């Protein structure tokens, strides 16, 4: 008797639940038909909130648009501040950045310059960049030169992503080795570590900015993996042997980076990159450089990146002029007379060939 009563109760409850579910569905459909605006708001919230898209029981995957590096799902954290705020560059200062070269003065400089030329040749070969031939043909037939050797916006972005993916290696290697050297010898480093790590961080920010404009494929990822591994180990061994040569090498390398971004700006201003003329700087660039309203174009972004590379050029040429073991870092030092030009983090007193030791010590 008890068993029969229990069975009937279960069946009744099941039917009642089914009826209530059906009524709920009908009410929902009716509400959807009469409240279109509310439905669209709910749909928007559904799309923007990943937690609402979680399905406990499913047999098919959810198709979602991919972001290259999406924001982390941390509702209680509004924003993570940068450890190294970027200095403010004026438009006049950035326009004064120019292509420059420091002449070699000893065997160490010559070794560094030869290494940079070989590296530049390899990068030009891989990316199909032939500026020398383009200039020679441009004097005879500009249209044919642009057709055969002209770079598109996408090709420049590919080159920039690859360049910036390895550009952050030298500063990290040098900062790491000096950090270990300071602990091992139980002596101060006199401010070199911070500047070197900040330089590496700045190069990584360049990479993150360009990744918002171009997403590399598997081939470039493999190329970056190999190049980064080889470059890291080469810099590691070289810095142990001659830190001065490594800083001169990076100084010459940054000279080439200034050349690259100067040519990109020239092509953009000449109308050869129409896809960049209306391209806005990514939000990550706006936040990092504090770009004001009306100065958030691709040209403004390239001006800032080129100015950064010009600053790295100066910093490494300056560090290459100093005593690697005893001299303090002039970019982390406080001078007694602030009115006299001296090394700074910004580009107010930019020196393409670096500051000589006698000028800063």
From Swiss-Prot:
It is a multi-pass membrane protein. The keyword Oxidoreductase applies. Fe cation 2 binds at residues 203, 254, 309, 312. Residues 343-361 have a biased composition (Basic and acidic residues). Fe cation 1 binds at residues 164, 203, 206, 309. Binds 2 iron ions per subunit. It is found in: Mitochondrion inner membrane. Its cofactor is Fe cation. GO terms for cellular component: mitochondrial inner membrane. Its main location: mitochondrion. Residues 318-361 are annotated as: Disordered. Belongs to the alternative oxidase family. This is Alternative oxidase, mitochondrial.
């Amino acid at each position: 008797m008890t068993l029969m009563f229990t069975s009937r109760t279960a069946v009744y409850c099941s039917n009642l639940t089914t009826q209530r579910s059906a009524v709920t569905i009908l009410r929902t459909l009716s509400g959807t038909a009469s409240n279109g605006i509310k439905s669209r708001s709910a749909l928007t919230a559904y799309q923007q909130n990943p937690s609402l898209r979680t399905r406990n029981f499913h047999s098919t995957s959810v198709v979602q648009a991919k972001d290259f590096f999406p924001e982390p799902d941390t509702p209680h954290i509004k924003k993570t501040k940068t450890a190294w705020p970027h200095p403010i560059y004026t438009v006049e200062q950035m326009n004064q950045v120019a292509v420059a070269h420091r002449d070699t003065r000893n065997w160490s400089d010559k070794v560094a310059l030869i290494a940079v030329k070989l590296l530049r040749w390899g990068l030009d070969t891989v990316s199909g960049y032939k500026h020398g031939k383009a200039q020679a043909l441009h004097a005879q037939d500009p249209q044919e030169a642009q057709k055969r050797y002209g770079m598109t916006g996408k090709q420049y972005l590919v080159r920039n992503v690859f360049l910036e993916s390895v550009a952050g290696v030298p500063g990290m290697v040098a900062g790491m080795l000096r950090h270990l050297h300071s602990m091992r010898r139980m002596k101060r480093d006199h401010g070199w570590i911070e500047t070197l790590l900040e330089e590496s961080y700045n190069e990584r920010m360049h990479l993150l900015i360009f990744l918002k404009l171009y997403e590399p494929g598997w081939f470039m990822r493999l190329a970056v993996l190999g190049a980064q591994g080889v470059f890291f180990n080469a810099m590691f061994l070289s810095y142990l042997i001659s830190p001065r040569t490594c800083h001169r090498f990076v100084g010459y390398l940054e000279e080439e980076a200034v050349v690259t971004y100067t040519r990109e700006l020239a092509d953009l201003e000449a109308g050869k990159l129409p896809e960049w003329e209306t391209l806005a700087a990514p939000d990550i660039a706006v936040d990092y450089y504090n770009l004001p309203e009306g100065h958030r174009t691709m040209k403004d972004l390239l001006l800032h990146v080129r100015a950064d590379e010009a600053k790295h050029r100066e910093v490494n040429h300056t560090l290459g002029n100093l005593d690697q073991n005893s001299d303090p870092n002039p970019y982390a030092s406080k001078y007694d007379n602030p009115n006299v030009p001296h090394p700074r983090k910004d580009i107010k007193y930019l020196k393409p060939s670096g500051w000589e030791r006698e000028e800063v010590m």
